[in-house]
C-alpha cells in the first residue's frame, strides 16, 4: 500500500500576528514532560538533585538546547552559507536545528550548572538521559508534520511507503521521520526506563548516560539509512551522511561512559 503524505499546516494556531508552530509546541511539550520525569528520576537512590534544583535547571536546559542546536546546525551543516549570511543565524523560525549541537549545548549546561550548585554531574546527567528520548520522539513527529527530512526511495519490500509531493517527485519513499521517531524515541525511551530501574546501574555514575549516548548513536546511524541526505550536503565518503559521521563518536563516548561507570561505582 502506497500512502500520500497528509498535508499539514505547520502552524497550530494564530492570534493576530502571533503564531504557534507544531515545532515550537514539540519543544515546549518535551521540556515540560522532561522536567517532570527528571524530577522523579533525580529523587531515586542515589539522589542526584533536589526538586528545586531540577526546576532551576529547566532554564539552563532550554538555553543549551536552543543555542547549541542552532549553532550546531550552522557549524556542522551550512557553515559557508551562514558565513555569508550571519544575520540568518538568529532566524530559528526558518528551521535548522542539530541534535548533536543541542546535545553539546546541554552537556555544557549540565557541567556549568552542576559545578555552580555542587551537584555530581554524571549522576545528574544520568537522570536527564532517561527523559531525552521523549523529546526526540516529539521532535521527529514535528518533522513529519512539517513534511521535512523525508526518506530515500523505498525498497519494494517496505510495506507502507509514502509519497512526499514536496520532494519534487512522486516516488514512494520511506517515512523516515516516523522510523526515526520509533528508534530514537520509543525504543530508546523503553530502554532507558528499564535501565534506570536497576539500582546497580544508578550507582554506576555515567552508565545511564552512556547507554543513552551509545543507543542514540546506533539509532541515528540506523535511521539515516532510510533518510534522504540534506540536499546541500548529499552523501559523504563511503555513502555516509553527516548524521552518521557525527553519531560515530557518540557510540564510542557512550561505551566509554559505561565502562567508566562500571569501574568507578559510587557509594
Task: Report residues per predicted region.
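A feature for loop-to-transmembrane-helix boundaries and adjacent hydrophobic helices
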Residues: 1-267
